[in-house]
UniProtKB/Swiss-Prot annotation:
Its EC number is 3.1.-.-. Toxic component of a type II toxin-antitoxin (TA) system. An RNase. The cognate antitoxin is VapB8. It comes from Mycobacterium tuberculosis (strain CDC 1551 / Oshkosh). This is Ribonuclease VapC8. Belongs to the PINc/VapC protein family. Gene3D superfamilies: 5'-nuclease. InterPro entries: PIN-like_dom_sf, PIN_dom, Type_II_TA_system_RNase.
Amino acid sequence: MTEGEVGVGLLDTSVFIARESGGAIADLPERVALSVMTIGELQLGLLNAGDSATRSRRADTLALARTADQIPVSEAVMISLARLVADCRAAGVRRSVKLTDALIAATAEIKV
């Protein structure tokens, strides 16, 4: 990135969860984006909310996430995902690689 160029930060689901929980969040880039997988993860959290207060907080978090640029799952992202998972397996990392996290990482590799 050159001087004066604005970077885009790809936000992971954990950033939204930290904000919802009142956790500390470092300064974010001026422009942010997210994988549509993050929308799915936040929607799942909303659907699994056990009470109305949690449901309300999660609905607010999902609404905030929807204001960011959403990056769709494309063929390039899926190819990157396959390579990332294969590389992890080749390095001996198997069960600890969550496909949702790998998909978000693949999105970051392609788009950011």
